[in-house]
Amino acid sequence: MQLNSTEISDLIKQRIEQFEVVSEARNEGTIVAVSDGIIRINGLADVMQGEMIELPGNRYAIALNLERDSVGAVVMGSYAGLAEGVKVKTTGRILEVPVGRGLLGRVLNTLGEPIDGKGPVDNDGYSPIEVIAPGVIERQSVDEPVQTGYKTVDSMIPIGRGQRELVIGDRQTGKTALAIDAIINQKESGIKCVYVAIGQKASTIANVVRKLEEHGALANTIVVVATASEAAALQYLAPYSGCSMGEYFRDRGEDALIVYDDLSKQAVAYRQISLLLKRPPGREAYPGDVFYLHSRLLERASRVNANYVEKFTKGAVTGKTGSLTALPIIETQAGDVSAFVPTNVISITDGQIFLETDLFNSGLRPAVNPGISVSRVGGAAQTKIIKKLSGGIRTALAQYRELAAFSQFASDLDDATRAQLEHGERVTELMKQKQYAPMSVAAQAVVIYAAEKGYLKSVALNKVGHFEAALLSFMNSEYAALMTNINATGDYNADIEGEIKAALDKFVATQTW
């Protein structure tokens, strides 16, 4: 039988009409390009934003760009051995890190793997690094203090549990020192700490870990490290990993403190990844979502109410609120706080502590500028005794700076102006504090009381430090019960004021400084 051309044409049309295209979801793809830690994959039909993609050799990449015909992913770690044609698989999982009490005292990388040589970590489970922050109804107002141990901060820029307080300044102005001292001061407070080091030298981080260990604070702290030599992806993800580890304590009705050191380097790492993924650059070449990069991280620091904790723990913990307090650090260039990332983080946080190079170089350490440093919510959380006593400190310093500038041009000053200048000089001198020497609430209260009530008038400017040291030694030996009472309660009443006044009168009479 011979078919003519018309029949053949009809047969082909019939077959074409009967043909069904079956779309098959594939979870395996092929690398089509590798460059600078970025891989482009074809053939992944079923992948979600932020999903872990399994690579050969027990390595992973994270899918960040989902395009029409390919997926752009960033490799976590080394990309040696990855080449065009290599097969990869989706996992269906978002990146998770280990969490739990067993992480305290350990040094971990971004993925939660131990890098301190102390064996495997004893974790209570895993938590995704990206979690939606608690909503408005689940939160509670900030009304309990986090004592940093710094007179300047605790008296003028108080920090509350659940607050986000930015530490901002140029390089070498004492930002890390302030944050580390705040961690050291928590060893007796019950607040668990997380220190996230982003883009720093390994030697610097080793020194920080050693100092925490020396001062007995490492046992209470988790250190998460993404050094300068590690892949940009790990530097970008490190703060989210640390935050999940801190949230473990918050969600179980405990208090935690997290330090991000520093978010400028995280933003640079994210900019690098975004540019390599060919996302359109914006201001200062940062991508358009760099604000969201930091806002979604810092919003997770919060104080949650008892209902949230009870619901999260399925009734295992009742009547307890939890908190995660954040101290993000931002490094400025030549004091420019109006740059893109600093202004973003200032607008996200609940206040900022400005550290200035000029103050640091003049010997005022911590180099806090009280004029432009502010705590927007911490005032409600300040310890009662410090709040009552420290009201005049900020005013004295502000008046002193104004008068000091004016007095350079005035040949003769009246007695009132001279008295204000001398008081301001002594308060400024009193605010100086050595590193790794955080002060208790009672010690701060006694010292501030001495300044406010004029006990420093007769003390020579170069003797203020000696006066403070001798006063605290005297108080701890002669009035130990009073100091213990103030530390325990934080109260301030006529009886406590009378005792402090009597103690100071007795001390000043000895002239032992």
From Swiss-Prot:
* PROSITE patterns cross-referenced by the UniProt entry: ATPASE_ALPHA_BETA (PS00152)
Question: Which chain positions carry the site (Required for activity)?
Answer: S373
Return the Pfam families for the record. Answer: ATP-synt_ab, ATP-synt_ab_C, ATP-synt_ab_N
GO CC annotation: plasma membrane; proton-transporting ATP synthase complex
Subunit composition and interactions: F-type ATPases have 2 components, CF(1) - the catalytic core - and CF(0) - the membrane proton channel. CF(1) has five subunits: alpha(3), beta(3), gamma(1), delta(1), epsilon(1). CF(0) has three main subunits: a(1), b(2) and c(9-12). The alpha and beta chains form an alternating ring which encloses part of the gamma chain. CF(1) is attached to CF(0) by a central stalk formed by the gamma and epsilon chains, while a peripheral stalk is formed by the delta and b chains.
Family according to the record: Belongs to the ATPase alpha/beta chains family.
PANTHER family from the xrefs? ATP SYNTHASE SUBUNIT ALPHA, MITOCHONDRIAL (PTHR48082:SF2)
Name of this chain's protein: ATP synthase subunit alpha
